[in-house]
UniProtKB/Swiss-Prot annotation:
Coiled coil: none annotated. Pfam families: Autotransporter, Chlam_PMP, ChlamPMP_M. NCBIfam families: POMP_repeat. Disulfide bonds: none annotated. It comes from Chlamydia muridarum (strain MoPn / Nigg). GO terms for cellular component: cell outer membrane; extracellular region. It is a peripheral membrane protein. The keyword Signal applies. The gene is pmpH. Belongs to the PMP outer membrane protein family. This is Probable outer membrane protein PmpH.
Length: 980
């Protein structure tokens, strides 16, 4: 069928002499000399359509345009592309245009590549544009810069704002909507003036830009707005319900018109704003997006390295990252009057952003219609500010700058989620003295988590500048619920402090002060101590202060706050008594400035693992208890001392059972089982009567289920691999052979969240011989095997404080051996009670001597709660005894088969249970640990079946069951061999 563009109102027959046609299955290239434009209302692609190297110039209209008011192009799963072309320069013309609505849908690919738009309408122009469905939408390496053409005889004039606002890919007055893209939506390396991709044409910017319901990746990369808005300029912006990853990288907004220099205050048109999005009078919204979102390496000459808007709203359903964005003015990542950011299952990270004001976020001054505000809510996932800097003051940290003192601030965290400021937050306007009432700062008015201010990540040089650790809010601070944490050298100054419902947690070197002129007050009823920060020799007593009165009263309580309880009580300081001078209350009022009451320690006697003892808190220094530096603490007034006293003089240590690490010695049991699996695979050679050189290859499987016994851990091991065997079978029945193989698998703990992924390499020698004992044939067979196994243990500890898992990893190796000597003899015929049974079922007896064991190397764990495992060992000796039955089938249509069954009893006559010493690295406490105590009596069943396959050799199967109290082991092997 010929290629066609069908239209209900336009017939292409009139253009047959001017257009080239081809089959629908091959792309059609329309060369530059094709007469344009196409006109139609409803156009359908019956094949791939490629517009290449077209020059529209100043005399030709749109390449594709509507015959009436609206234009619809349906791709029908074909490609529409424009490459290496120049658009029309005529007024109201573009590559694709309509007066009212344009609908582009269902393309396998819609591609604009290496095109130049010379007209004021950009590349796609209509009051409303809709792009829906399809697999791939790609705009790459295009240029949409525009300046008006001079009249005849005139020289070109300097571009003005009115001209450059007409250069974008999409020229839209009402709205642009992109939806349902299945694989990728890409805008890459596009150059324009205001908004390289989208610029609102409405007078008040009342245009919408929407991307929703897309399944694939969304990419905006390396786009440049020479005058402002690297990607989008003005209009309401919405990204909603997209499922794929969203990446905004390397976009930039410059100020080629010099608007920033001419208008230092925000003008009608905003020059150099928004490296990605600039819509200073409208809202930018991200919600319902399931994939990760990343803004990185974007740049703005003005404000908003990534986004400048009046209102910015973000709900993070997945991970969101703002990193390494830069703005020369304010807001390295975001510049907005109103900022609403929350998590809903994903985390949000602001890291490495830079700006002169607000390295990550700058909240602008209010306007008449909007007072603005900052609302951050770590509802389900953390919000973190780290390593954000000022761009014009090297070495100065800055997370958020709030330019107006009257802006309200709400910082919230729920449950185990945290909001962490490693960089300071500053609210003031140094250019203008504060007027009116300062805004309120509310902590957890809608949450019960932790809002944290810390100087933990400051470098030594950054610590020399106190600004890097100081956050400032001029308004009143209220802790409504959850906790406000100021720790590790951070300082927070506010107006007044009220924390009667929520908790104030202080750490080493922290300072929380109310400094509202001469009226600052501080009232706290719930205190928390960040224990970890104080357990170092360089600790500093925290400060809680006010200009007038400081009160810790109304039945005050103190909570011991720790991120990991088990790790905390591993600290060797708790072997002995220790006193922590926790907090000093400071008031500038000479008399009656400080009020204290006896403090109740909430969780003083909570059961825990680690060193055992008890806590107490008092406003007086306790006797005979040194501080964490080993010195006697100073006796300070208005200071709360927190004291630990061990339960005995030698420090009793209680080990958490899940840290025993019994998987390490149990790995020797697993290695021994793997070697027995290897032996099981050699059964075919032991029962074969063939003569010659035999090579075989087979698949092996090993399954071991060991049940827990009280507080002793069990394990579940699954291993599989291969075995290759070469053996010489002699005429006298003797055999000598070698085997090589590998097994891979995993062992899981039955009690705890720990698993060991291992692989074992095995090499063995084996043989068989026949001996005549008093005229009776006796079969003697033997094997020796060596195994080298590598083990990688991964352990997860659930942390009830954070509701998250802490992880640790450990690697070690085992050297294992297995040897046996066995004999098979028809002694059952010599016993009168068993003689007839032996003759009827072809039964013989057997006895074996087995020896197995090995050594494990030492290993040091990394990660959470690290341990060290010393070298370990384990050995086992057994004397299996049982009977053997043989059966042979010779069907007419089926190949002959030989079945061998061994049944017996295996007593373990000597054993060294696998064991080693485990040491807690934090304190050196050693604990001997043993592997699972296996029962010493087992019953086993071994089944071997050989199938003689003509021209191929033999196929065989082995299955073994070893059953003992609290453990079941299964061995399986399937193989093929060939006689040479």
């Amino acid at each position: 069928m010929p290629f066609s563009l069908r239209s209900t109102s336009f017939c292409f027959l009139a253009c047959l002499c001017s257009y080239s046609y081809g089959l629908a299955s091959s792309p059609q290239v329309l060369t530059p000399n094709v007469i344009i434009p196409f006109k139609g209302d409803d156009i359908y692609l019956n094949g791939d359509c490629v517009f290449a190297s077209i020059y529209a110039g100043a005399e030709q209209g749109s390449i594709i345009s509507a015959n009436g008011q609206n234009l619809t192009i349906v791709g029908q799963n074909h490609t529409l592309s424009f490459t290496d072309s120049q658009g029309p320069a005529l007024q109201n013309c573009a590559f694709i245009s309509a007066e009212e609505k344009i609908s582009l849908r269902d393309f396998s690919s819609l591609l604009f590549s290496k095109n130049v738009s010379c007209g004021e309408k950009g590349m796609i122009s209509g009051k409303t544009v809709s792009i829906s469905g399809g697999d791939s939408i790609v705009f790459k390496d295009n240029s949409v810069g525009y300046s008006s053409l001079p009249s005849v005889g005139q020289t070109p004039t300097t571009p003005i704002v009115g001209d450059v606002l007409k250069g974008s890919i999409f020229c839209v007055e009402t709205g642009l909507e992109i939806s349902g893209v299945k694989k990728e939506l890409v805008f890459d390396n596009t150059a324009g003036n205001f908004g390289a991709v989208f610029c609102s044409r409405a007078a008040q910017g009342d245009t919408t830009f929407t991307v929703k319901d897309c399944k694939g990746k969304i990419l905006f990369q390396d786009n440049v707005g020479s005058c402002g808005g690297g990607v989008i300029y003005k209009g309401e912006v919405l990204f909603q319900d997209n499922e794929g990853e969203m990446l905004f990288r390397g976009n930039s907004a410059h100020d080629d018109l010099g608007i920033l220099d001419a208008n230092p205050q925000p003008p009608t048109e905003v020059g150099g704003g928004g490296g990605v999005i600039c819509t200073p009078e409208k809202t930018v919204t991200f919600k319902g997006n399931k994939g990760p979102i990343t803004f990185d390496y974007n740049f703005a000459k003005g404000r908003g390295g990534a986004i400048q808007s009046q209102t910015f709203s973000l709900v993070a359903d997945s991970a969101v990252v703002f990193s390494n964005n830069t703005a020369e003015k304010g807001g390295g990542a975001i510049y907005a009057l109103e900022v609403n950011v929350s998590t809903n299952g994903g985390s949000i990270l602001f890291e490495g952003n830079r700006a002169s004001e607000g390295g990550a976020i700058c909240v602008s001054e209010p306007i008449a219609a909007n007072n603005g505000g900052l609302t951050l809510h770590a509802a389900d996932g953390d919000i973190i500010f780290s390593k954000n800097m000022t761009s014009d003051r090297p070495g100065e940290r800055s997370a958020i700058r709030i330019l107006d003192s009257g802006t309200n601030v709400s910082l919230n965290a729920s449950g185990a989620s945290k909001m962490i400021f490693y960089d300071p937050v500053v609210q003031n306007n140094p250019a203008t003295p504060p007027t009116g009432t300062s805004g309120e700062i509310k902590i957890n008015e809608s949450g019960s988590g932790s809002v944290v201010f810390t100087a933990e990540t400051l470098t030594p040089s950054e610590k020399l500048n106190v600004i890097n650790a100081t956050s400032n809010f001029p308004g009143n601070l209220t802790v409504s619920s959850g906790e406000l944490v100021v720790t590790k050298g951070a300082t927070l100054t506010v107006g007044n402090i009220t924390a009667t419902s929520g908790r104030v947690t202080l750490g080493s070197g922290a300072s929380l002060s109310a400094v509202a002129g001469t009226a600052g007050t501080c009232t706290v009823s719930k205190l928390g101590i960040d224990l970890e920060s104080f357990l170092v020799p360089t600790y500093e007593t925290a400060k809680l202060g006010a200009d007038t009165t400081v009160a810790v009263n109304n039945n005050p309580t103190l909570d011991l706050v720790m991120a990991n309880e088990t790790e905390m009580y591993d600290n060797p300081l708790f072997m002995n008594a220790v006193t922590i001078p926790f907090v000093t209350l400071v008031s500038l009022q000479t008399t009656g400035g400080v009020t204290t009451s006896a403090v109740t320690l909430n969780n003083a006697d909570t059961a825990h693992y680690g060193y055992q003892g008890s806590w107490s808190a008092d406003w007086r220094r306790p006797p005979l208890a040194p501080d964490p530096s080993g010195m006697t603490p100073l006796d300070k007034s208005n200071t709360l001392y927190v004291t630990w006293r061990p339960s005995s003089n030698y420090g009793v240590y209680k080990l958490d059972p899940q840290r025993r690490g019994e998987l390490v010695p149990n790995s020797l049991w697993v290695s021994g089982s793997a070697l027995r699996t290897f032996t099981n695979g050699l059964k075919e050679h032991y029962v074969s009567r063939d003569v010659g050189f035999i090579a075989s290859v087979q698949a092996l499987g090993d399954y071991v289920l060991n049940y827990k016994q009280g507080n002793r851990d069990g394990f579940l091991a699954r291993y599989g691999g291969f075995q290759a065997v070469a053996a010489s079978h002699y005429e006298n029945g003797g055999i000598f052979g070698v085997a090589f193989g590998q097994l891979y698998g995993q062992t899981k703990s039955r009690l705890y969240d720990s698993k060991d992924a291992g692989n074992i390499t095995i090499l063995s020698c084996f043989g068989r011989s026949y001996i005549d004992v008093k005229g009776t044939e006796t079969v003697v067979y033997w094997e020796t095997a060596y195994g080298y196994s590598v083990h990688r243990m991964h352990t997860q500890y659930f942390n009830g404080k954070t509701n998250k898992f802490d992880h640790s990893k450990c690697r070690w190796h085992n050297n294992s051996y297995y040897a046996f000597v066995g004999a098979e003899h028809n002694f059952l015929e010599y016993c009168i009670p068993t003689r007839q049974l032996a003759r009827d079922y072809d039964l013989t007896g057997f006895m074996r001597f087995e020896m197995s064991g090995g050594w494990s190397s030492g290993a040091k764990e990394t990660g959470a709660l690290p341990r060290h495992f010393d070298r370990g060992t384990g050995h086992n000796m057994s004397l299996p005894i049982g009977v053997v039955a043989h059966a042979v089938s010779n069907g007419r249509r089926s190949p002959p088969s030989k079945l061998t069954i061994n049944m017996g009893y295996r007593p373990d006559i000597w054993r060294v249970t696998p064991h080693c010493n485990m040491k807690i690295i934090a304190n050196g406490v050693k604990t001997p640990i043993q592997g699972s105590p296996l029962a010493r009596h087992a019953f086993f069943l071994e089944v071997h079946d050989t199938l003689y396959v003509r021209h191929l050799g033999r196929a065989y199967m082995n299955y073994s069951l070893d059953a003992r109290h609290r453990q079941t082991t299964h061995f399986v092997s399937l193989g093929l061999n060939r006689i040479f």
